[in-house]
Amino acid sequence: MSLLNTFIRYTKLSFLVLFSMCFSLSALAAEFTGRLSMHWNDKHHCTKHAQMFVDEVFEKSNGRLKIEVFHSGQLFGIREIMGGITSGAVDLGGVVGVVGFPKINKNFNVATIPGLFDSFEQQREFFQKSDKGQEIWGDLLNKTNSTLVMYNPVGPVMTFSGARELTGVDAMKDLKARRLIGAEEPMWKAYGAKIVGLKTSEVYTALQTGMIDTINTPPQSIRAYSWWEFLK
């Protein structure tokens, strides 16, 4: 089915749009309305980019193809969206690749290895042109019945903390760090930090109550979700 997938790297990330075979076949009708679900809120630039895509589709189809946008996890959250896509509950979805894809093919974790790829292009070429990458990507597409539509760059990932200035490895010890993906856990353990697994929708309250004080995320998310209030 459809995917709006985010490749997370510890230096940069980008996301791509996939849409379901079911959606493309249904679009053969004279008019069709599809549904796009994502966990990002309406202030997040990923949502704004997705809306630009939706507007372009509507224009290019002369109004025959309309996509309704459901942001902020109205339909599915960051961890639930794969189920919604696979079941056909939505036609397109915003999927964080390293959250959803390793459950389908564990070898997709190669996308999380810091420094392995020099650029977005090199990472994309691995999945599209190399034998092993094509094998991984083909398995994902076959099992989710989806196809790639576009890439949408997100930006760099940084570590933010409200506990103290992160001046070195010693400063990382005993931080209360949010973990989104499994690949983050070995890093935080090596630093001696306390680890708390949280969905995006749970981060604000966790920062507010002191459950966590540190997070890995793109700077744009800090602003979009008002996390900056606790990470100054």
Model-inferred region functions:
Residues G63-L65, I81-V95, A193-I195, T209-T217:
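Alpha-to-beta junction loops
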Residues K43-E68, G182, P186:
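Short, polar/charged alpha-helical segment
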Residues G97, A183-E185, K194-K232:
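Pocket-lining segment of extracytoplasmic ligand-binding domains
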